[in-house]
Structure formats: structure tokens, C-alpha cells
């Protein structure tokens, strides 16, 4: 039984609504909600994932920016379960406050045009998040999960993997959406690392080092990081200054950012 409703996709909001039952079921299976967990869906859209999750779990919080979807979501959810709707831009939502002491499980088919800002916003609240299951452009998921030496290994890879375990799950073709996007999508799982295992001393400095390193990725680290690192930083961290950012492991960036010179 599918309770999703029809609503026109808004290009300005980057909306592509999932419509294929097979992939909807695969996402719900990947999330595998359990009693007592607090599920939060970002951008429920027409309810393709919302209502199967609600039917399976009984309660769900959703964050929806499009006011035209609020009433249809409310009406369709009424006979199924308890749906709490937060009508707000997701980037303005305080996930820590939403969690209220119980780590939340984030789910969502993220709008292509703001997927990276949403990911970094979620990272800011990692201590309040149990895990995340997101559908994004496959190109973005490839970058998120990439390792050193890959052409798509970059700032997004390092920043996410420093704070989360990142696992690409499966690809979703354009035909599974209405309207179909021009590219493949993919589902990814992110599990925030325990705070004690994230050995980053200064989050801002770490972000600055990673940004500078990949901002000029064809240059050696000596040149790319000239504004944020001195030669002694490389020596203390055991990182070769003639290497390039794409050759460094996540742990290398962490050591480099953590160095404190006397």
C-alpha cells in the first residue's frame, strides 16, 4: 500500500521525487528502523519514503521547506502514524535540539542543489546523530567514499571520513524519479565516529588545512599550504611537503592540523 500523493516538482528547490517501489523498499530496508529510535527525514516530498517508514515505525519527524507539501503530508499521514512536521529550511534546523537527548537517525533524498551544505550542517551536530542514510547524486557519493589516489578524492572525502564511517550502498537510476534527473543517484550511509576517536584538536584549523590543500590540488603541499603551515609542521606530522593533497590519508591531514609549534 502506497500513501504517497502527487505534487508538482519545483525546479527552484531541486526536487526530484522518488517513485520506484523497488528502490523505496531498498532504502527502508537499509534504514531498518527499530522501536524507540527517533527518525528524522529531510525533505519528504510526496512521501515516497515517509509513509513506508511511518507505517513500519509508527512515528516520524520530517523537515519540509515547501509549504505546498505540508497539508498533503499531514492528511496522508493521519491514518498511518504520528507525523511531526518541521516547516523550515533544513540549514536552519538545530538537530541537537530536535534530538533532545536521544540521538536521531537522519534519512533523506537530498536536493541536489544544497546536498553538500546539508552534509556539513549535519556534521556540526554529529554528537546528536546516530546515523544518516541519504540519497544524492552518484557523483557526490563517489566523492564522499573515495580514498587517496582517486581522481574524485577531495575536501568532501576527507571532511566526512574524518568524522564518519562512509559506506556507499547502491545506485538509483534516473528512471526511478519523477521528473527523472539527468544523472544517476546513489544511497550512502554515514555513521558518526565516537567523539573520543575523532582526534581533531581544532575543527576550524583542520577544515582550513583541508580546504587549502585541495584548493590547489595540482600543487605540492609545501605551496598549497603555504598560508596555513610552516616547514616545521610537515616535519612534526611526518608528512612529505612535496606530496599532493590527493596522496594523503585522512589521518595525515589530522596530524598536520594538530601540530602546535612552540
Swiss-Prot record:
Origin superkingdom: Bacteria
Molecular function via GO: 16S rRNA (adenine(1518)-N(6)/adenine(1519)-N(6))-dimethyltransferase activity; RNA binding
Where in the cell is the protein located? Answer: Cytoplasm
Record-linked InterPro entries: KsgA/Erm, rRNA_Ade_diMease-like_C, rRNA_Ade_Mease_Trfase_CS, rRNA_Ade_methylase_Trfase_N, rRNA_adenine_dimethylase, SAM-dependent_MTases_sf
The EC class name is transferase
Q: What does this protein do?
A: Specifically dimethylates two adjacent adenosines (A1518 and A1519) in the loop of a conserved hairpin near the 3'-end of 16S rRNA in the 30S particle. May play a critical role in biogenesis of 30S subunits.
Q: What is this protein called?
A: Ribosomal RNA small subunit methyltransferase A
Q: Which organism is it from?
A: Xanthomonas campestris pv. campestris (strain B100)
Amino acid at each position: 500500500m502506497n500513501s504517497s500523493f502527487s505534487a508538482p516538482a519545483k525546479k527552484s528547490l531541486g526536487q526530484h521525487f522518488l517513485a520506484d517501489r523497488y528502490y523505496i523498499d531498498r532504502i527502508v530496508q537499509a534504514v531498518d528502523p527499530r522501536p524507540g529510535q527517533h527518525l528524522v527525514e529531510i525533505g519528504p516530498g510526496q512521501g515516497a519514503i515517509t509513509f513506508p517508514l511511518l507505517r513500519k515505525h509508527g512515528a516520524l519527524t520530517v523537515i519540509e521547506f515547501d509549504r505546498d507539501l505540508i497539508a498533503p503530508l499531514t492528511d496522508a499521514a493521519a491514518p498511518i502514524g504520528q507525523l511531526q512536521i518541521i516547516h523550515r529550511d533544513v540549514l536552519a534546523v538545530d538537530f541537537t535540539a530536535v534530538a533532545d537527548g536521544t540521538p536521531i537517525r537522519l534519512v533523506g533524498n537530498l536536493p541536489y542543489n544544497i546536498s553538500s551544505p546539508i552534509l556539513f550542517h549535519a556534521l556540526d551536530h554529529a554528537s546528536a546523530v546516530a546515523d544518516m542514510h541519504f540519497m544524492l547524486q552518484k557523483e557526490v557519493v563517489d566523492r564522499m567514499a573515495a580514498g587517496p589516489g582517486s581522481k574524485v578524492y577531495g575536501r568532501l572525502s576527507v571532511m566526512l571520513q574524518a568524522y564518519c564511517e562512509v559506506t556507499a550502498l547502491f545506485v538509483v537510476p534516473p528512471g526511478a524519479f519523477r521528473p527523472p534527473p539527468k544523472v544517476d543517484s546513489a544511497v550512502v550511509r554515514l555513521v558518526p565516529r565516537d567523539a573520543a576517536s575523532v582526534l581533531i584538536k581544532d575543527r576550524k584549523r583542520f577544515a582550513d588545512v583541508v580546504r587549502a590543500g585541495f584548493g590547489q590540488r595540482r600543487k605540492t603541499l609545501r605551496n598549497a599550504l603555504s598560508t596555513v603551515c610552516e616547514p616545521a609542521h610537515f616535519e612534526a606530522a611526518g608528512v612529505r611537503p612535496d606530496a599532493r593533497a590527493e596522496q594523503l590519508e585522512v589521518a595525515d591531514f589530522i596530524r598536520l592540523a594538530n601540530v602546535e609549534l612552540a
